[in-house]
């Protein structure tokens, strides 16, 4: 039976809705019991009202509830909350020990917490606390004066989430095919990634890499780089690693070993005490593959379009010297080295940062080499401005080293540190040698000048100084492939001019690195980048960029100059001009780029080189819920044709489900598995992922130990999808797989009029729930109810007086959801 709208019905519906709104408002704002004026309802309905559950402020019917948790505006996963009655018409929420720990109540205010049972604590008497149960959310708000920690931009350890157990597999595959006019064709395929298993707080990881070349078959291989396990130790603000790993020290040079490492993890500290990850700047003359390695281990690989590039996805745990290889599609290979930034080893007053390892050096085939060693270093904050640091590296024989240094915070003049390292070792010929190495580091941010000297350092090593890896190569293999360093100095900095004027704002980036050796050629790299946005002749946001780099490496000198200008056409499209000079060969290109669709970006270019040869190239990037794909192609007249692609993807599985997804950038990032109760196609975080047919999606590349959000893109959802909750926040430990279930429903919407079998309406305020117990509607006057997110023929329960009284069945067909459906509520 269809019942049309009438002005009288609409007016009654509005009044009923206002009445319920006032009920909830009174519930939240008053401390006394609430009485409702039901005379605003029709006389025939005044005796058919069930508002008993609203009559006492904050009264919740005793029982177990499955609720989302919100602490001071931060969301946590659902959990069972038991409400118990403590007096007539008064109930309190039982806070279990785990949730109580997350509140981080300081010792002074513990006296206000009442223990009712070992698993039940009453926190309602804490001064200034607010506890609300609204819309399936237990919302607790605490004054910061009650809490242990005052930092508003930092999540304390009690609130960290170790995630759920599960399997992960991430991969990056890069393929190229080159067809030169002269010589042989070459097809290559490289890949790297990680496989892993999370068990509680332990993370087991196996990192792999592989190479294939049709032209150079001797390079074809597949290796498991390292297999290790690690676990965060929040009480120590440290990380324990066992297995194959690399020494990560701010004092001693990195090397590969098998053993155990216990190290302070500064990511667990407040942001003001944390470091940063290194950046790599360069210029690609054509579409190119950029590879970053350290001691033969592949750390990062990607494809970049022609022009200046910046790689800033490296872990902040990467220390020491990095090898960068840029493989152009025209066959040219450019190599250089980057020294990662090493901030002065400063520590907060009275605190100690430490790093200790025990193991044996190992080579890439997992074989041990060299003696058993112990390494330990520390930094102690003596006071607000001075830190003392040092360390030792000891072996059972043949090699020992110690280091001692001091750091000073000079206030507005920056931070400076200096240290000395002494080594004692034996050569391949059993010759005993010893030497010293001296190092200075400086860092300063000039906020008032919008400038930063990110790192300035100097190091001098005597000819007889040996790092541990040099000792292993020399003592056991009789070789030294990397040379003996003599002097190294490096500086990187940036400056923003006219930072407060968007029309004039100009950014300058400078870098310089010099390394000479006792036994090989000097290496140098220096570069400058200037970028500016400006407007002219009514055209806004014109972008210009000028970059120049010189690299001297292995006796070769490479000079590159690049100038770019881009003019917006509106709606994410732009045209541009590029001039590039590589060792005197000039290429000029015109380009068109379309960035309107974030998930599908592309650019094409065409132009001429100084030898009158035509050049053209293109670049396309596609982001999907399953992987990220970067494809490129380039052609140079009478020279070559090349195509390439990179695919980054991953797979995550837990007991809640599994999903393919875009790849995780590094092994140290976290991820969140989102569950939408089987509803497919729900987009999250700007469409970073979309749930699959099973209602599972995975958000990757989330920063560990920082607050992160999983957000449903409500404006992008299909019309037949609804959710009671659109955002969840958490702070995940390193490598964790977070899990959050969102109450999402997909289905029909309808207005219905409910009647019992004796032709009476259910009482005003009765609740309609599905078989999961989720509330999906509330009965208003004359049995009117709005229902959403239900399936055809689905059975629903109607509850009043604290129990299910009858059930209704959604029709097999709904022709018009705006017309009232008459549904009979069958007795239970």
From Swiss-Prot:
Q: Which UniProt keywords apply?
A: Cell outer membrane, Fimbrium biogenesis, Membrane, Signal, Transmembrane, Transmembrane beta strand, Transport
Q: How does it sit in the membrane?
A: Multi-pass membrane protein
Which GO biological process categories is it annotated with?
Answer: pilus assembly
What PROSITE patterns does its record include?
A: FIMBRIAL_USHER
Report a single Gene Ontology molecular function. fimbrial usher porin activity
Question: Where does the record say this protein resides?
Answer: Cell outer membrane
What InterPro entries does the entry give? Answer: Fimb_usher, Fimbrial_membr_usher_CS, FimD_plug_dom, PapC-like_C, PapC-like_C_sf, PapC_N, PapC_N_sf
Pfam families, per the entry = PapC_C, PapC_N, Usher
Signal peptide range equals 1-28
Q: Cellular component GO terms, alphabetically?
A: cell outer membrane
> Is Phosphoprotein one of the keywords UniProt gives this record?
no
Summary of the function given for this chain in its UniProt record: Involved in the export and assembly of PMF fimbrial subunits across the outer membrane.
In the record, the note on similarity to other proteins reads:
Belongs to the fimbrial export usher family.
Q: What is this protein called?
A: Outer membrane usher protein PmfC
Organism encoding this protein: Proteus mirabilis (strain HI4320)
Q: Which gene encodes it?
A: pmfC
């Amino acid at each position: 039976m269809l019942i049309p709208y009438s002005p009288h019905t609409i007016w009654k519906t509005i009044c009923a809705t206002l009445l319920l709104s006032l009920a909830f408002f009174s519930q939240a704002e008053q401390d006394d019991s609430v009485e409702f004026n039901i005379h605003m309802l029709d006389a025939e309905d005044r005796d058919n009202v069930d508002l008993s559950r609203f009559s006492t402020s904050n009264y919740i019917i005793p029982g177990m509830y499955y609720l989302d948790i919100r602490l001071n505006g931060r969301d946590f996963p659902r959990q069972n909350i038991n409400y118990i009655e403590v007096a007539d018409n008064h109930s309190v929420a039982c806070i279990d020990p785990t949730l109580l720990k997350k509140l981080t109540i300081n010792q002074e205010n513990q006296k206000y917490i009442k223990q009712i049972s070992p698993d039940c604590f009453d926190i309602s008497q804490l001064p200034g606390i607010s506890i609300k149960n609204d819309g399936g959310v237990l919302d607790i708000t605490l004054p910061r004066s009650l809490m242990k920690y005052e930092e508003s931009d930092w999540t304390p350890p009690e609130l960290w989430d170790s995630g759920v157990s599960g399997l992960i597999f991430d991969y990056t595959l890069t393929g190229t095919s080159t067809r030169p006019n002269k010589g042989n064709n070459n097809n290559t395929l490289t890949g790297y990634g990680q496989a892993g298993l999370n068990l509680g707080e332990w993370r087991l990881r196996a990192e792999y890499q592989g190479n294939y070349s049709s032209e150079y078959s001797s390079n074809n291989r597949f290796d498991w780089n390292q297999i290790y396990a690690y676990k965060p130790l929040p009480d120590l603000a440290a990380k324990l690693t066992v297995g194959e790993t690399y020494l990560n020290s701010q004092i001693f040079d990195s090397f590969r070993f098998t053993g155990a490492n216990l190290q302070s993890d500064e990511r667990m500290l407040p942001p003001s005490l944390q470091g940063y990850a290194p950046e790599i700047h360069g210029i690609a003359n054509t579409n190119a593959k950029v590879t970053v390695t350290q001691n033969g281990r592949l750390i990062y690989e990607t494809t970049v379009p022609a022009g200046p590039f910046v790689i800033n996805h490296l872990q902040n745990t990467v220390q020491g010297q990095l090898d960068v290889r840029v493989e152009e599609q025209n066959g040219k290979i450019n190599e250089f080295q980057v020294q990662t930034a090493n901030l002065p080893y400063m520590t907060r007053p009275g605190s100690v940062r430490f790093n200790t390892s025990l193991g044996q050096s190992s080579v890439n085939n997992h074989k041990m080499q060299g003696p058993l060693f112990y390494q330990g270093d520390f930094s102690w904050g003596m006071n607000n401005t001075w830190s003392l640091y040092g360390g030792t590296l000891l072996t059972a024989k043949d090699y020992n080293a110690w280091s001692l240094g001091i750091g000073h915070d000079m206030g507005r003049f920056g931070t400076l540190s200096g240290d000395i390292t002494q080594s004692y070792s034996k050569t391949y010929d059993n010759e005993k040698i010893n030497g010293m190495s001296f190092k200075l580091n400086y860092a300063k941010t000039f906020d008032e000048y919008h400038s930063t000297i990110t790192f300035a350092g100097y190091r001098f090593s005597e000819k007889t100084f040996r790092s541990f890896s040099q000792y292993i190569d020399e003592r056991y293999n009789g070789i030294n492939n990397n040379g003996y360093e003599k002097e190294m100095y490096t500086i990187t900095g940036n400056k923003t001019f006219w930072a407060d004027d968007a029309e004039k704002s100009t950014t300058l980036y400078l870098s310089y690195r010099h390394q000479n050796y006792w036994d090989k050629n000097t290496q140098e790299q220096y570069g400058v980048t200037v970028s500016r946005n400006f407007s002219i002749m009514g055209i806004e946001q014109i972008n210009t960029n000028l970059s120049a780099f010189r690299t001297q490496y292995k006796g070769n000198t490479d000079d590159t100059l690049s100038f770019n200008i881009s003019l917006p056409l509106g709606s994410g499209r732009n045209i541009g001009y590029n001039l590039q000079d590589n060792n005197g060969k000039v290429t000029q290109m015109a380009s068109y780029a379309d960035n309107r669709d974030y998930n599908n970006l592309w650019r094409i270019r065409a132009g001429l080189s100084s030898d009158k040869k035509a050049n053209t190239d293109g670049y396309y990037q596609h982001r999907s819920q399953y992987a990220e794909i970067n494809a490129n192609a380039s052609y140079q007249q009478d020279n070559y044709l090349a195509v390439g692609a990179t695919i980054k993807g991953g797979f995550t599985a837990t007991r809640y489900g599994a999903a393919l997804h875009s790849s995780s950038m590094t092994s140290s990032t976290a991820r969140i598995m989102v569950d939408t109760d089987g509803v497919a196609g729900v987009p999250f975080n700007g469409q970073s992922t979309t749930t699959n047919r099973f209602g599972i999606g995975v958000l990757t590349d989330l920063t560990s130990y920082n607050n992160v959000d999983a957000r449903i893109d409500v404006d992008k959802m299909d019309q037949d999808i609804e959710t009671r909750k659109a955002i969840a926040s958490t702070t995940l430990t390193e490598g964790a797989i977070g899990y959050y279930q969102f109450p999402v429903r997909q289905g029909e919407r309808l207005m219905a009029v409910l009647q019992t079998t004796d032709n009476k309406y259910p009482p005003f305020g009765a609740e309609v729930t599905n078989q999961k117990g989720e509330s999906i509607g509330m009965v208003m006057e004359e049995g009117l109810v709005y229902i959403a997110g239900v399936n055809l023929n689905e059975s629903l329960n109607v509850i009043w007086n604290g129990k299910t009284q009858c059930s209704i069945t959604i029709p097999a067909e709904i022709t018009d959801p705006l017309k009232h459906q008459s549904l009979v509520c069958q007795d239970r």
